[in-house]
From Swiss-Prot:
Keywords on record: Repeat, Seed storage protein, Signal, Storage protein
Alphabetized PANTHER family for the sequence: ZEIN-ALPHA PMS2
Family: Belongs to the zein family.
One Pfam entry name: Zein
Protein name per UniProt: Zein-alpha A30
Superkingdom of the source species: Eukaryota
InterPro entries noted in UniProt: Zein (IPR002530), Zein-alpha (IPR051903)
Other observations noted: The alpha zeins of 19 kDa and 22 kDa account for 70% of the total zein fraction. They are encoded by a large multigene family. Structurally, 22K and 19K zeins are composed of nine adjacent, topologically antiparallel helices clustered within a distorted cylinder.
Native species: Zea mays (Maize)
Length: 234
């Protein structure tokens, strides 16, 4: 009887321990291997044997794959940095050679433009005409180049003497530019006596006698017949 009770207690204890026991499954290598990158070395797959060491081993494997490449990368970058000034210098030399070839190809035209263009645009177009213009006296310049030196009046380009006469008479009347003879007969220059234009001597006499007597303006003969008393005219 006692033996039966002891066996019953043993069975109850085993059942209780089986109910509270924890199952530890074996590590599966297939899912972990599928998560690893394909470019890692074959030694990385061996770290999956122990799940506790897996992150540490993976980190070591990645570092071992990158570190051998870093010196090569540093050497290439330093070489590129050293070559950049050489590239700039080469580009500057090529540009200078191109400019030199362009200047040598058009040396005559370049020298003419540099000498004459800042002073006159005519030198860039026709150097011979520019030299002739520089050698001409100042009095002959309007006749040789009327459009350049007399742009304010078109008459000077056609007839220089007529233009000079017009410039002398123009401040008094615009009619002088058309007909100088008609301009002299106008009352603008003879406001005191209308008939004095044909005779300048009579005009001067009238200008002298005008402040004393108005009779000289109408009848010169009657004015001379007037008696002179005390130096005054009546």
């Amino acid at each position: 009887m006692a033996a039966k009770i002891f066996c019953l207690l043993m069975l109850l204890g085993l059942s209780a321990s089986a109910a509270t026991a924890t199952i530890f499954p074996q590590c599966s290598q297939a899912p972990i291997a599928s998560l690893l990158p394909p470019y890692l070395s074959p030694a990385v797959s061996s770290v999956c044997e122990n799940p506790i060491l897996q992150p540490y081993r993976i980190q070591q494997a990645i570092a071992a794959g990158i570190l051998p490449l870093s010196p090569l990368f540093l050497q290439q970058s330093s070489a590129l940095l050293q070559q950049l000034p050489l590239v700039h210098l080469l580009a500057q030399n090529i540009r200078a050679q191109q400019l030199q070839q362009l200047v040598l190809a058009n040396l005559a035209a370049y020298s003419q433009q540099q000498q004459f263009l800042p002073f006159n645009q005519l030198a860039a177009l026709n150097s011979a005409s520019y030299l002739q213009q520089q050698q001409l006296p100042f009095s002959q310049l309007p006749a040789a180049y009327p459009q350049q030196f007399l742009p304010f009046n078109q008459l000077a380009a056609l007839n220089s003497p007529a233009y000079l006469q017009q410039q002398q008479l123009l401040p008094f009347s615009q009619l002088a530019g058309v007909s100088p003879a008609t301009f002299l007969t106008q009352p603008q220059l003879l406001p005191f006596y209308q008939h004095a234009a044909p005779n300048a001597g009579t005009l001067l006499q009238l200008q002298q006698l005008l402040p004393f007597n108005q009779l000289a303006l109408t009848n010169l003969a009657a004015f001379y017949q007037q008696p002179i008393i005390g130096g005054a005219l009546f």
